[in-house]
UniProtKB/Swiss-Prot annotation:
Entry's EC annotation: 5.4.3.8
Modified residues (N6-(pyridoxal phosphate)lysine): 264
Subunit and interaction comment: Homodimer.
Alphabetical GO biological process terms: protoporphyrinogen IX biosynthetic process
Cross-referenced SUPFAM superfamilies: PLP-dependent transferases
Protein name: Glutamate-1-semialdehyde 2,1-aminomutase
Length: 422
């Protein structure tokens, strides 16, 4: 089996055989398929197995694998540019496109990952407000920056540890943890620390404790508290941006953040991130202001070209989001019916083209505490069952399942057929 052979050899040269922990399939537990290629809604491993892909590279591949327009943009650009570390026209084009098609971004700074975007956004908020503390929420994941690894979601959550070794206590002393979807908890924190709170950073749709949409009163309450105390509201839309809607979850909720972080979809499948917001805030970044942030590969021309091709295609085809919502509704309705018919305790949370299946007897999953009660042993069996039937979902109870525009009703039917035989 080439998959197993390649993975075993990978362990000799990469910790755990992977470059990101969840790829090791530790929680399932299986050896992961080693992916060779992808086309449209499908991926193929080194053993020749075909899977309908509902991971979509953890979100970015909303257009499907190897979309022709994105591939052509990469090919065309790479004939003349790989990297300059200098100003290019294509970075202007993508920056301008985002600023003119998004409602709440007046200026933007390109970086190379979601982690870079969120850590830079927090630094900017601290520099702008001249305050130290930030508020984040249990189970919300904002990357592996030390200040965020207090109570994180996803793989950290699965392993049942609150943070990470190697993070000094001093790094997290200014990070205050609140319960997601609990506005009273945040009010109490502001009553105590409001005068030194630089920002709230929040996923409007949480994706790394499973998908948990923020409640409208909760998110609006955060906006109001930030206004009252002079703190900034940072929406981490690394996962939800350009996915739940082109303009992100903030457009669905009608809430205006001060800073928005983006990544995943905006890079068209290449390493990319960005943060943007009000001009008066963004102008605090060097070289205009005192907040220093830099990057050799930031604004890489090939990445910018892939991102521009992706966002133009999404923005110019609003029917894509209509299709994704239709498929999402069908999948959600079908799984709920199977759960009822077979008496399998499940909660299905969905926002647009991202959703999660929680194996729990609770009636809802609204925060980290609820998510932790889910049965990961049953999920591991479910994952193996789905993989054996050619359905590729994330190997963790606490990761999202994603749709892309190349998925069809037939693919949804196959997903539901597999669930029905579990």
């Amino acid at each position: 089996m080439r998959n197993d052979k390649i993975f075993e050899e990978s362990k000799l040269y990469m910790p755990g055989g992977v470059n990101s922990p969840v790829r090791a399939f530790k929680d399932v537990p299986l050896n992961p398929p080693v992916i060779k290629k992808g086309r449209g809604a499908y991926i193929y491993d080194e053993d020749g197995n075909e899977y309908i892909d509902f991971v979509c590279s953890w979100g970015p591949m909303i257009l499907g694998h190897c979309d022709e327009d994105v591939v052509n943009a990469i090919k065309y650009t790479s004939e003349n540019a790989i990297s300059f570390g200098a100003t290019t026209k294509i970075e202007l084009e993508l920056s301008k496109y985002i600023c003119t098609t998004m409602d709440n971004i007046e200026m933007i700074r390109m970086v190379n990952s979601g982690t870079e975007a969120t850590m830079s956004a927090v630094k900017l908020a601290r520099g702008y407000t001249r305050r130290n503390k930030i508020i984040k929420f249990s189970g919300c994941y904002h990357g592996h920056f030390d200040d965020f690894l207090v109570e994180a979601g996803s793989g950290v959550m699965t392993e049942g540890i609150p943070g990470s070794a190697g993070v000094p206590k001093d790094s997290i002393k200014n990070t205050i943890i609140a319960e997601y979807n609990n506005l009273e908890d945040v009010k109490n924190i502001f009553n105590k620390y409001g005068s030194d709170t630089a920002a709230i950073i929040v996923e409007p749709v949480a994706g790394n404790m499973g998908v948990i949409p923020g409640r409208i009163d909760f998110l609006k309450g955060l906006r109001k508290l930030c206004d009252e105390y002079g703190s900034l509201l940072i929406f981490d839309e690394v996962m939800s941006g350009f996915r739940v809607a082109y303009k992100g979850a903030q457009s669905l909720y009608g809430i205006k953040p001060d800073i928005t972080t983006m990544a995943k979809i905006m890079g068209g499948g290449l390493p990319c991130g960005a943060y943007g917001g009000r001009k008066d805030i963004m102008e605090n970044l060097s070289p205009l202001g005192p907040v220093y942030q830099a990057g050799t590969m930031s604004g890489n021309p090939i990445v910018m070209a892939a991102g521009l091709a992706t966002l133009k295609k999404l923005n110019e085809n609003p029917d894509y989001y209509v299709k994704l919502e239709k498929l999402g509704k069908k999948l959600e309705k079908g799984i709920k019916q199977i759960s009822k018919d077979k008496n399998i305790p499940m909660v299905i949370n969905r926002c647009g083209a991202m959703f999660s299946i929680f194996f729990t007897s609770d009636s809802e999953v609204k925060n980290y505490k609820d998510a932790r009660k889910c049965d990961t042993t049953i999920f591991a069996k479910f994952f193996q069952h789905m993989l054996e039937r050619g359905i590729y979902i994330a190997p963790s109870q606490f990761e999202a399942i994603f749709l892309n525009v190349k998925h069809t009703e037939e693919h949804i039917d196959k997903f539901l057929q597999a669930v029905n035989t579990f």
